[in-house]
UniProtKB/Swiss-Prot annotation:
Entry's Gene Ontology BP terms: chemotaxis; response to amino acid; signal transduction
Keywords on record: Cell inner membrane, Cell membrane, Chemotaxis, Membrane, Methylation, Transducer, Transmembrane, Transmembrane helix
Deleted gene: phenotype: Mutant is defective in taxis toward L-Gln. Mutant also shows decreased chemotactic responses to TCE, chloroform and methylthiocyanate. The deletion mutant does not show significant reduction in swarming or immobilization near epithelial wounds, but the pctABC triple deletion mutant shows a significant reduction in chemotaxis and immobilization along wounds of human cystic fibrosis airway epithelial cells.
Region (Disordered): 405-424
Protein name: Methyl-accepting chemotaxis protein PctB
Methyl-accepting transducer domain segment(s): 357-593
Annotated organism of origin: Pseudomonas aeruginosa (strain ATCC 15692 / DSM 22644 / CIP 104116 / JCM 14847 / LMG 12228 / 1C / PRS 101 / PAO1)
Stretches assigned to the Periplasmic side: 32-276
Chain's role: Chemotactic-signal transducers respond to changes in the concentration of attractants and repellents in the environment, transduce a signal from the outside to the inside of the cell, and facilitate sensory adaptation through the variation of the level of methylation. Responds to L-Arg, L-Gln, L-Ala, L-Glu, L-Lys, L-Met and L-Tyr. Also involved in repellent responses to trichloroethylene (TCE), chloroform and methylthiocyanate.
Disulfide pattern: none
């Protein structure tokens, strides 16, 4: 997009960016200065207002404290009931305090105005009494909400002494409405408000009654401000507040602070207005400067504009190379005009030389085209005759290839038959070997079965011995049983053992008889197996003789097939040699034809190039003729 802009527009854009950057930096710098100045003024103002308000509160409370202390000193001289009542009923005390009272060490309590109190009311157990007695001086209690009037109340208590000995405590309940009025009377131009807070963060006086007696952490859960010197910021209902705290000095027993909360956005509203004014002024200045620069650049760029028009006339007009630019100044534009005139002069000379060369090139191109057409005719005749020879050789080669293919097929079939005969011969030989091995294994099996039969005879003899032992054991067990019966009760256990031995001998005799029966069946089966294997051995020997005769016949067939295969291979070899000669001749003819075709194509390409050259030469002449030289 920037590349498509005019040079004058680029200058304007660059100047506008410089001006905008300058004004932006100036605006930011001025904004920073104004912000610092406003913050400094705001801090001074808030500090001053806090100090003044704290002083007003301190003066107001100090006057009330003096009233209580003067009353205590007066009662110290005479605290008779009549004097006490008269002093407590003074109009000044009645208009200043809600209640004024005297609590004595003997438990006597006198108050004005009077109120209903419990019968067991003892002033000596009240916090204000104990605080003043313990401190030995005037004390102030923490503000508390009085249910009867729904107002914050503060108690001032001062010890009363007579002859250096305390005889009671003088107190006064003071409403904080005056303090509320003092604090609420502060006007911050709608930016904020003041409030009274104790040292532990409890809000005592606040324009919003819902915030009274709450802690700062409850009101400002996020970024809870710290009470002390300096300023802090905290979030309240989505707005940033600036807070400062000024201590109320000179009050014994009280740690109070005047807090001031200001809306930060409103406090810096003037800065926003100044920033907006600066931005508007900067925009107006940028527009004015751009307009002035535009008019100035248009005047300064006029020589360059005239030069551009002259160049456009030379480029898009009649191509008059005899025109020259007028030099009207000695600045950069004048030097550019002089250089352009020199350039056009050199182009003029070059175009004049190109015009003569273009005419010569056109004539030479015409001669080359004529020669190429003649060569094309001769090449066509040569190509036709070469194609005829190639066709005849191709037919001869096809016949030779057919013969070679048939001979090769015959040789292939003969080779297959020979291979199959060889395979059959090998199969017969393998069959003979298998028959011989089978016969040998049958003979070995017969021998093994005979050996097994002889061993079963030995087992039968062993069983006869076992049967004899069993019979003898049975007789011995029977004799033992008889002797045990004669022994009576003493031989009963031995009789049981003898009976068990006789049963075991009987079972051993039965098992020996079963084994004898199985051995006899095994001997019969072995004799039958020997007979069957002997007959199988005879049949296998006959099969071996038949297989030997088949192998001899296959050997004879294999020899005949090998002779036929040799003849076919000789024919195929001779035919392949003939085919190779024909192929070589065909390749030579084909190569000649290919070279001829390439020559024709080259001539055609040359002819086309010459035609294109002639066309370009004509175009060059037209272009050169378009210039006025």
């Amino acid at each position: 997009m920037i590349k498509s802009l005019k040079f004058s527009h680029k200058i304007l854009l660059a100047a506008a960016l410089v001006v905008i950057a300058t004004f932006s930096l100036f605006t930011l710098y001025n904004d920073s200065l104004q912000r610092a100045s406003i913050r400094e003024d705001l801090e001074d103002y808030l500090h001053e207002m806090g100090e003044i308000t704290a002083s007003n509160v301190q003066n107001w409370l100090s006057g009330r404290i003096l009233l209580i202390e003067n009353l205590a000193q007066t009662l110290a001289r005479d605290h008779s009931p009549e004097t006490t009542q008269a002093l407590l009923e003074q109009p000044l005390l009645g208009s200043t305090f809600l209640f004024t009272y005297l609590g004595q060490t003997d438990g006597t309590y006198t108050a004005r105005p009077t109120s209903d109190l419990p019968a067991d009311y003892d002033p000596r157990r009240r916090p204000w009494y104990n605080a003043a007695t313990s401190a030995g001086q005037t004390t102030l209690t923490e503000p508390y909400m009085e249910p009867a009037i729904h107002e914050l109340v503060l108690t001032i208590a001062s010890p009363a002494r007579q002859g250096g000995q305390p005889f009671g405590v003088v107190g006064g309940d003071l409403s904080l409405q005056t303090v509320v009025k003092i604090i609420n009377s502060l006007d911050f131009g709608g930016m904020g408000y003041a409030f009274l807070v104790s040292g532990d963060g409890k809000i005592l006086v606040h324009p919003d009654k819902d915030q009274v007696m709450k802690s700062l952490s409850d009101v400002y859960p996020r970024n809870t401000p710290k009470i002390g010197s300096g300023f802090s910021e905290a979030e309240l209902h989505g707005n940033t507040r600036i807070l400062s705290f000024s201590p109320v000095k000179g009050l014994s027993g009280l740690d109070w602070y005047i807090g001031i909360s200001v809306d930060k956005d409103k406090a810096y509203a003037m800065l926003t207005k100044l920033r907006t004014s600066a931005i508007v002024a900067a925009l107006i200045a940028v527009v004015a400067i751009v307009l002035l620069l535009g008019m100035l650049i248009r005047v300064l760029m006029q020589p360059l504009t005239d030069m551009g028009r002259a160049m456009q006339d030379i480029a898009q007009g009649e191509g008059d190379l005899t025109k020259r630019l007028k030099v009207t100044s000695n600045d950069e534009f004048g030097a550019l005009a002089i250089s352009f005139n020199r350039f056009v002069e050199r182009i003029h000379e070059s175009i004049r030389e190109v015009a003569g060369t273009a005419r010569q090139l056109h004539d030479v191109a015409q001669l080359v085209v004529n020669a190429s057409n003649s060569s094309m005719a001769n090449s066509d005749e040569q190509s036709n005759r070469t194609n005829s020879v190639a066709a005849a050789i191709n037919e001869l080669g096809a016949a030779a290839q057919e013969i070679a293919r048939n001979a090769a097929d015959a040789s292939h079939h003969a080779s297959d038959a020979n291979h199959q005969a060889e395979d059959g011969k090998q199969v017969v030989e393998q069959t003979i070997r298998a028959m011989n091995e089978l016969s040998e294994k049958i003979s070995a099996s017969c021998a093994n079965i005979e050996a097994l039969n002889s061993r079963t005879v030995n087992i039968g003899q062993i069983l006869e011995v076992i049967k004899g032992i069993s019979e003898q054991t049975n007789l011995l067990a029977l004799n033992a049983a008889i002797e045990a019966a004669r022994a009576g009760e003493a031989g009963r256990g031995f009789a049981v053992v003898a009976d068990e031995v006789r049963n075991l001998a009987h079972r051993a005799q039965e098992s020996a008889q079963q084994i004898q029966k199985m051995i006899e069946e095994l001997q019969i089966g072995a004799q039958e197996a020997v007979s069957t294997m002997t007959e199988s051995q005879r049949y296998s020997l006959e099969s071996v003789e038949i297989a030997n005769r088949a192998g001899e016949r296959l050997s004879s067939v294999t020899g005949r097939i090998a002779e036929i295969d040799g003849m076919n291979q000789s024919v195929a070899t001779a035919t392949e040699e003939q085919t190779a000669v024909v192929d070589s001749l065909n390749m030579d003819i084909t190569e000649i034809n290919t070279l001829n075709q390439e020559g024709v194509e080259n001539l055609q390409a040359t002819l086309r190039a010459c035609g294109e050259l002639e066309t370009q030469a004509g175009r060059l002449r037209q272009l050169v003729d378009s210039f006025k030289i």
